[in-house]
Structure formats: structure tokens, C-alpha cells
From Swiss-Prot:
Pfam families from the UniProt entry: DUF2715
InterPro entries, sorted: DUF2715
Protein name stated in the entry: Uncharacterized protein TP_0698
Keywords: Signal
Secretion signal span: 1-19
Lineage: Bacteria, Pseudomonadati, Spirochaetota, Spirochaetia, Spirochaetales
Keyword field contains Signal: yes
């Protein structure tokens, strides 16, 4: 009975019962991106090294955590301070202890010209959609939870944009409600 109550509260359902967990999480926060690599300035920048971009972002995650911790998710991220839209489809593994969850995931990252120009690059260099491989490590801490709704503060660090011999290392801090079924 205690397990069922905990599951309905949305806190221990995944860890105790091993049940499927569907979640929707709109977030708002700040991302700082450090860019490094060797591109010879062919993308419109001087060297592509040591460039930092800070932006206020809005993000929505929709995903499913399976019985064994495997997680499948899709996310859309947009800058609130300039034109920037990024979409990701990810597969990974989630480990959860109490109100703390860690997710390691990778998949496909897609963005267009708006992504390029917001990061100081020539839009002509990205005349089509940019596909790259993200590697994300996200740690979430649930501040409170009731009736399946949780407020989560999360930080994510990952290496993205494995393209043109260039890497970006984004650091994000976001907060928002997480709705779980």
C-alpha cells in the first residue's frame, strides 16, 4: 500500500515499482556554450576556439522511461534572447535515487540557419539543416512532488555538434514543472 501511495505521489514509482513513466517537462533557464575546435575560420569565425555564448532558453522535454531505466525522449529548445531553435531525439539510461535522477543520453540534434547565426557563424555556411550527435549528461533534483507533478532544478552538460571538427560544450541550469504519469 505504501508503494502504491508513493507511486501516486510520483516520487518513488519508477525506483520501487519499475513501472513505465511518461513525463512532460517545460523548462526555462540559462545556457552557457563554450565552443572549441579547429575549423580554420571557414565558417565565418576567426578560429572557432574559445568562444562563449550565453542565452536565456525555453525548453520542453517529452519522454518515456521504461522498466529497466532505458529512456526515450524528444526535446525542443529555443532561445528567448535571439532567434534560435534546436530539436533533439534522444535515447539513454536513467538512474534515480529518491528525488535525484541522472540521465545519460545520445541521439540526433537538428537545427537550422537560426542556430548558426545565434552562435556567431555565417548563415551561408549552414544553408541547410545541421545534423549532429549530442552526448548529454543531465542531473535533475526534484524540489517537491505531489499528485504526479514535480518541480525540478536540473543541470546538463554535454558535447554537441560533432561536425566540421568543432565541438560545443553547453552548460544549462533550468527549472520548471515535470508532469509524470
Amino acid at each position: 500500500m505504501r508503494r502504491l501511495l508513493a507511486c501516486s505521489a510520483g516520487v518513488l514509482c519508477f525506483s520501487q515499482l519499475g513501472a513505465l513513466e511518461l513525463f512532460l517537462s517545460p523548462k526555462i533557464g540559462i545556457t552557457s556554450v563554450y565552443q572549441f575546435g579547429s575549423n580554420g575560420g571557414s565558417d565565418g569565425t576567426s578560429s572557432g576556439k574559445g568562444v562563449s555564448f550565453d542565452r536565456l532558453i525555453g525548453r520542453v522535454d517529452l519522454g518515456l522511461i521504461l522498466v529497466n531505466g532505458l529512456t526515450i525522449s524528444a526535446s525542443a529548445e529555443s532561445s528567448l534572447t535571439n532567434v534560435f531553435v534546436r530539436a533533439q531525439a534522444l535515447i539513454g539510461y536513467a538512474v534515480r535515487v529518491g528525488g535525484l535522477r541522472a540521465i545519460v543520453s545520445s541521439g540526433v540534434n537538428i537545427c537550422g540557419d537560426s542556430c548558426a547565426t545565434s552562435e556567431g557563424k555565417s548563415s551561408a555556411w549552414y544553408s541547410k539543416l545541421l545534423y549532429s550527435v549530442p552526448l548529454n549528461l543531465e542531473v535533475q533534483y526534484y524540489l517537491t512532488s505531489f499528485a504526479g507533478v514535480a518541480v525540478a532544478a536540473s543541470t546538463a552538460v554535454g558535447v554537441r555538434d560533432f561536425n566540421f571538427k568543432e565541438f560545443t560544450l553547453p552548460l544549462s541550469l533550468t527549472i520548471g514543472p515535470t508532469f509524470r504519469v
